[in-house]
């Protein structure tokens, strides 16, 4: 997955990558076997299950191929990702789908800007009462890559603005009584716990937070980590990968989309160094951390000034979504499209991590996240292509780029679809299904927002699978994967995840999820050698296909529920 997913570690991040050589055969069964791994396989609790039928074997083969070291982690904008995209395009062709990308190909170009921070010239200094406190790069702070300028150096007064949330419909304003114009905002992440999950998700999003800060006149931003932030993602993990590039969509003018140029510098400070930022202020970092937990944060002006400086290497790069189409069978409805998605990219090559065998690995292969999701997407496409008659509405199958960079491939597709925008009726997304213990259920995320709930329930009965509620609703993963780009475009969407109820009373899917998040998520050990339970992967593909079939054949297109927060904010015409 991509941007911050919490839990004991459910967080998308961002890392680098690059390579592979030989051409891939067009036929799935002719695809070359994965090369021998360059490092020892990660330790696992049980032996990886052996695929028991053709469907399980197809999914296993796709996962093992896409998660092989030859693809070097499939980072967006690298040769390794492009070779993975070539593989998926050949699989789409072998299934019998039509190309639906640019110029009659399977590929939709996605223009990106890549920004990489440089250690030289980076500074964060606190000027208080005639003394300067210089924070240490990497250990105490990291500058954010600047998409607007190769170099910045600014000094200004600072204001603590709580979590930087302005939610007038909830009577909440962190900016009340504060003058942020021409100043540097010091801010915590997240949103008040009293907000419902939907609004907390929306106002926690980095894009909305930066927009609010820019609108209130901030010229710089210092994000201060809390202990809760670092319980989910330790500062050392962030600091070890400081050279990872970040990306934004590149507009027609060559500039980054949503880069907020009025904010001229940004940095993040570790929780351990927070007291340096708040030195000589009216409240200590510990007091503010407690206030954040209690929902009682109040902003204030800080004494003295802050200085932010950084250098960034900015360069244009290109990546590709892989897009295929299954034509609908009804003359009146075939122009409408159900969009299936799974992100193809992962984290590439990053900081080496020592495995349980003592050996280091730098390739973040992303077997669960999200080679497995792409393999399920391919099996879904194969299932629907084999059905006769075809669904009445058409189906689009999209392997997306740059999810790990902030849902960029999905955002580009949702705003630049190969068909008229109004022709997209629903999005069905799969991302990081942690299928490491047999379950009797599936967790559908986001079903409460639209009429897709009834469709999903009927499809689940068709397949014979139980549905369970989101086990971690406070983590609002509904806005943390590619479906959110479609939601922002006004398109009802759901996201299918693995189940949480044990099928055999022995192996616990919840425990397996927590272990994966703790030990393997966004680490090199997310390998195809993990004990993926292939029958659950096949079942998820069947359910995915049945949902799409029911949406495809329905008399009415899906609609947002009356009064829904996301429908009200993003539905077409808003």
Where do the protein language model's features map onto the residues?
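A conserved hydrophobic secondary-structure block that centers on an alpha-helix together
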Residues: 162-235
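N-terminal hydrophobic or amphipathic helices/low-complexity stretches enriched
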Residues: 30-101, 273, 335
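C-terminal motif of bacterial Sec signal peptides marking the signal peptidase cleavage site
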Residues: 23-26
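Soluble metallo-hydrolase cores and metallopeptidase-like ectodomains found primarily
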Residues: 127-129, 139-177, 255-366, 379-382, ...
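Acidic/histidine-rich catalytic neighborhood of metal-dependent amide-processing enzymes
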Residues: 204-208, 212, 229, 348-354, ...
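Metal-dependent peptidase/peptidase-like ectodomains
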Residues: 139, 248-283, 400-505, 511-512, ...
